[in-house]
Amino acid sequence: MTQGVTPISDDERRGRMDKARRLMAENKIDALYLEAGSSLFYYTGITWGRSERMFAMVLPREGEPAYVTPGFEEERAREQIRFGDDIRRWEEEESPYRVVAGIFKDRGIRTGRIGIEESVRFFLFDGVRKEAPALEYVDATAVTAGCRMIKSPAEIALMQRANDVTIEAFKATVAGLREGMTPAEFRADCAAAHQALGFSGGVMVNFGKYSAFPHGSTLPQKLQKGDIVLMDAGCGVEGYRSDITRTLVFGEPSDRQREIWNIERKAQDAAFAAAQVGATCESVDAAARKVITDAGFGPDYRVPGLPHRTGHGIGLDGHEWTNLVRGNTTKLAPGMCFSDEPMLTIYGEFGVRLEDCMYITEDGPRMFTKQSPSIEQPFG
């Protein structure tokens, strides 16, 4: 499934930096500081692992970006840098924070506001602040989230492929369910299925009563006939994530399992129907929660019931801006992407979660995947 995958173009990345500069101007930010991570990849296409050594980019409101790299990594950095040629190295005994402060000075930023990308680690931020104390340091989420929350058609196409891959991997893994299987064996099978399709993916899976734990149990499990199987998996395509959960029964479902599964599906449908342009994020959560409460569960986050938000944003990170949760008055706009995953948790018995991701269009929400038709048919 690797054929036909189109990476994000350099022109699109330049457009992202231009949008960041416009948002910086609106928020009176003179430069943006980012370290290695998904936002750096978003703007530049650079993939770089985090360590104690700083690799960073400064994106000024005016002018090309500047990069800070360990001296011995300069050649590797140059392999990936495609925007701007201001590459500054620091040797092992030198201060990278002083190098960043030098960029601010050289770009004429002696006073003003520096936006810190929200995932920057404290020791990096603190080091920069001490070297350039005359500057004000502010949260740059208005810039980064302002860019990343709205996906382009190219991004949505990559997310579509990631979802297609995970569904196929799920199908292959479910075909191998067997009595006595452990979660570790299921995880290995699912990883191998993703790999066979050309991508790296992983899964969380729980059986029976342990399916009630939203993020799983650490206790030993072995699959038995009649067990609920709750599996939550995803993969990345050019960095863009899928996130899908399916719940089925190994064997013949009981009336109770079928009843709870059907309530969960109605809650997922209610959230999807509510996810219209201009609706608030909290109204989507409320729609799903009402179905579960009306069925006699909850209320609020009480269990048996729905113990967590209805969904989260998704893109380059499996969880990103913004959440479908009570109190979030952000309005849905075309290009936003979310998971739709209310859950019905009944500790001591089982849990059911159905998760499909959706993207918002002018005409309403669209699912990346076909929803589960029934507890007997996990794949549409």
Q: Across the structure, where does each feature detected by a protein language model lie?
A:
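Active-site neighborhoods and metal-handling regions in enzymes and metal-associated proteins
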Residues: 1-380
